[in-house]
Amino acid sequence: MTRPAPTRRRFLAAAGLTAAGTTLGAAALTACAATDQGAKSNSTQTPAAAAPAGGGGPAVEPPVTTGAQALQRLAEGNARFVSDQAGHADEGTERRVAVSQAQHPFATVLGCVDSRVPIELVFDRGLGDLVVVRSAGEVLDRSVTGSLEFGVAELGTPLLLVLGHQRCGAVDATIKALDAKHPEADGDIDYLVEALRPAVQQVAGRSGDRLTNAIHANVDLVLAQLRKSTVIGPLEKSGKLELAGAYYELDTGKVVIS
């Protein structure tokens, strides 16, 4: 007997989600929630940041309901990080208890696996604030894209940020592999090289630092791919979701929004 293919509804049920009355793009449900959250629209959801913080930051922050507000909150957190004023908010016992039954993050961030770019620290955020997905060079596959779709559609974040970074090793390795005329790499690393090849080729002959140019080009290409998603694209067109690219400077700690 052939087992039925897994559907989106089955996945949500298996994850412990309560989907009654919920529509795609309006869901603010969490896979960890034990209580029924009901249907919430993007414009009315109460983000995680509104729960009491358990660290050095403000006890209560105003709700985030738009991509612009989410970007502003990330920018403020990064400014604290750069100036060594990080409050390490949303990390203590009070916060942990507050988010134990439900999560309402305000941004979904795709970043690289580089150990020098810990996304929550870079933006001075804590428990329940961000949906973070990481892959080498921000390379997309079905798992990565599906995770991002989950963040924006089911958890209802109004912002999807793609974060590249200075001296990305994955992009640098791709450049070296292509220059050596034998781009094949060991194991599934070859998959990364092939995925990053278009960004490297796109900047061939361009003035400036080749690696930096390719990193920026890769962020743009990833954003273009995400806009083709049948989940992400319509959310952006409807105004419920904002997509943005950014570049993290290893030397300064600063995040520059594209």
List the predicted regions and their residue ranges.
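Active-site cofactor/substrate anionic-group-binding motifs, chiefly glycine-
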Residues: 113-138, 143
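Short glycine-/acidic-enriched loop or helix-start segments at secondary-structure transitions
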Residues: 119-120, 171-173
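N-terminal secretory signal peptides and thylakoid transit peptides that target proteins
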Residues: 1-23, 27
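Gly/Ser/Thr-rich loops at beta-strand to alpha-helix junctions
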Residues: 115-116, 166-170
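Short beta-strand segments
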Residues: 110-112, 134, 161-165, 244-249
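Divalent-metal-activated hydrolytic enzyme cores
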Residues: 12-13, 33-104, 128, 137-146, ...
